[in-house]
């Protein structure tokens, strides 16, 4: 349930206005102009004043019983629905839903153009126009922060860091040795630019390697809460434009992640590995060091990758193998287990 403590409902909205806002909607030819939509709800909870959406076919059964006034469905949806629910067909129903959220809701929390008194900002730092610097933020020498950026309470921006325009840095983020592009979001507790896990061993002693690389983050990147991105030991750690990195991800020193890649929670990428463009790594994936994951490759959740992956391939399991082989192995293991259990009973 959406709480009015945190978000302002901008409704009601006319259904015709919603259709115009979403642009690519295929709607019935005649819709009553006075239909008012007050809120967005899931199918099971929607009332006659609400709009809903369907993106996962396993929830299509709820369309028969929903009370929603309207529902956004996939373009090719032909299933049954409550005759009182107006179906709005979209090329991408989940994307349409994400746009609809912006149309209906705005956060109550606002950020004035202000540097709070408790913030410590070095004289040599450059703060752009229309920025908010929150309570107890520390910004060291020679930092550059672009226009319209937000740095929330308790964050630390180390010497020489460069952050682009329209950044949103949430609470208790630590950034060192980094150059960050425009329109970047970094969620609470993330740590960027610390030493990587690099040691040379001599006569039984592990000697720390001085890391002289940095972290480079492109434009329009989102980094999740409590994620850690180490700076390179010699080569830089690089996160390209449009990447989405979930919470609790560890990215080792010198890793390169290509444009538009998605990395899900609790994944770990060891040092000097390269992830191509538009790759997808599921939850709890492990990538060994010095590997190359080709463009568009996908790794299923909990996959353990110990070898290079060709572009476009989908793998799973540990050690990771082609996804269909992994499925076959799982089926065979179940069959062997049944056979073994049958023999034991005899």
UniProtKB/Swiss-Prot annotation:
Pathway: Bacterial outer membrane biogenesis; LPS lipid A biosynthesis
Assigned keywords, A-Z: Acyltransferase, Lipid A biosynthesis, Lipid biosynthesis, Lipid metabolism, Repeat, Transferase
InterPro entries noted in UniProt: Hexapep (IPR001451), Hexapep_transf_CS (IPR018357), LpxD (IPR007691), Trimer_LpxA-like_sf (IPR011004), UDP_GlcNAc_AcTrfase_non-rep (IPR020573)
Reaction it catalyzes: a UDP-3-O-[(3R)-3-hydroxyacyl]-alpha-D-glucosamine + a (3R)-hydroxyacyl-[ACP] = a UDP-2-N,3-O-bis[(3R)-3-hydroxyacyl]-alpha-D-glucosamine + holo-[ACP] + H(+)
Active-site positions on this chain: 253
First-level EC class: transferase
The protein's Enzyme Commission number: 2.3.1.191
Pfam families per the UniProt record, alphabetical: Hexapep (PF00132), LpxD (PF04613)
NCBIfam families xrefs: lipid_A_lpxD, PRK00892.1
The protein, known as: UDP-3-O-acylglucosamine N-acyltransferase
Protein species of origin: Rickettsia peacockii (strain Rustic)
Gene: lpxD
């Amino acid at each position: 349930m959406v709480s009015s403590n945190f978000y302002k409902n901008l409704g009601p909205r006319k259904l015709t206005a919603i259709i115009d806002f979403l642009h690519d909607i295929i709607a019935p030819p005649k819709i009553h102009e006075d239909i008012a939509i007050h809120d967005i709800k899931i199918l099971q909870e929607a009332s006659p004043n609400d709009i809903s959406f369907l993106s996962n076919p396993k929830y299509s059964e709820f369309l028969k019983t929903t009370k929603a006034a309207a529902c956004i469905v996939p373009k090719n949806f032909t299933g049954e629905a409550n005759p009182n629910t107006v179906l709005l067909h979209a090329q991408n129903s989940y994307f349409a839903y994400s746009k609809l959220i912006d149309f209906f809701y705005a956060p109550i929390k606002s950020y004035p153009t202000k540097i709070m008194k408790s913030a410590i900002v070095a004289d040599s730092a450059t703060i752009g126009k229309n920025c908010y610097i929150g309570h107890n933020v520390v910004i060291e020498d020679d930092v550059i922060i672009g226009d319209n950026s937000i740095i929330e309470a308790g964050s630390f921006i180390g010497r020489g860091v460069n952050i682009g325009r329209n950044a949103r840095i949430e609470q208790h983020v630590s950034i060192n040795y980094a150059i960050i592009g425009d329109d970047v979001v970094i969620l609470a507790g993330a740590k960027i630019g610390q030493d990587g896990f690099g040691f040379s061993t001599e006569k039984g002693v592990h000697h720390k390697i001085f890391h002289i690389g940095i972290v480079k983050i492109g434009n329009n990147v989102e980094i999740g809460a409590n994620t850690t991105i180490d700076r390179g030991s010699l080569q830089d750690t690089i996160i390209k434009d449009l990447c989405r990195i979930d919470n609790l991800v560890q990215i080792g020193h010198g890793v390169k992640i290509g444009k538009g890649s998605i990395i899900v929670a609790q994944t770990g990428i060891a040092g000097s590995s390269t992830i191509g463009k538009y790759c997808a790594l599921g939850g709890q994936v492990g990538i060994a060091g010095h590997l190359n994951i080709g463009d568009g490759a996908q790794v299923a959740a909990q996959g353990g990758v110990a070898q290079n992956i060709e572009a476009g391939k989908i793998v799973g399991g540990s050690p990771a193998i082609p996804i269909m082989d992994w499925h076959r192995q799982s089926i065979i293991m179940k069959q062997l287990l049944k056979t073994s259990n049958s023999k034991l009973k005899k």
